[in-house]
Amino acid sequence: MLVPKRVKHRREFRGKMRGEAKGGKEVSFGEYGLQATTSHWITNRQIEAARIAMTRYMKRGGKVWIKIFPHKSYTAKAIGVRMGSGKGAPEGWVAPVKRGKVMFEIAGVSEEVAREAFRLASHKLPVKSKFVKREAE
């Protein structure tokens, strides 16, 4: 599972998810990509579930690049605890993904296999997404 090795601050502000992604909108490493069309937080468990779904379908063929990393911590108070008395304990890690960001890339497989692998992976993610190809240079 993806987690940062060390962080400066354990608890972070939630922040805002306005606008489009600044970078990472094109397929840069592989031939095909899965691009987010909505913005959302994606947890490290969701990233791992999507990766497993893709690699199992491809049967060890091709290469997968994960272009997002869960560097932001999120907190939660225990169930039944009243409001107040500080921020909750760190619960997990998320990758804030804005619309337009290419989250995963694949190379070394046919387009049909890549489409199906991304379709299976997209069911594991909380964002709407679309299949994109690398643009000819």
UniProtKB/Swiss-Prot annotation:
Name this polypeptide is given: Large ribosomal subunit protein uL16
Subunit structure: Part of the 50S ribosomal subunit.
Superkingdom of source: Bacteria
Gene Ontology molecular function, alphabetical: rRNA binding; structural constituent of ribosome; tRNA binding
Record-linked PANTHER family: 50S/60S RIBOSOMAL PROTEIN L16 (PTHR12220), LARGE RIBOSOMAL SUBUNIT PROTEIN UL16M (PTHR12220:SF13)
Gene: rplP
Family, per entry: Belongs to the universal ribosomal protein uL16 family.
Pfam families: Ribosomal_L16 (PF00252)
Species per Swiss-Prot/TrEMBL record: Streptococcus thermophilus (strain ATCC BAA-250 / LMG 18311)
Keywords: Ribonucleoprotein, Ribosomal protein, RNA-binding, rRNA-binding, tRNA-binding
GO annotation, biological process: translation
Gene Ontology cellular-component annotations: cytosolic large ribosomal subunit
InterPro entries xrefs: Ribosomal_uL16, Ribosomal_uL16_bact-type, Ribosomal_uL16_CS, Ribosomal_uL16_dom, Ribosomal_uL16_sf
Function: Binds 23S rRNA and is also seen to make contacts with the A and possibly P site tRNAs.
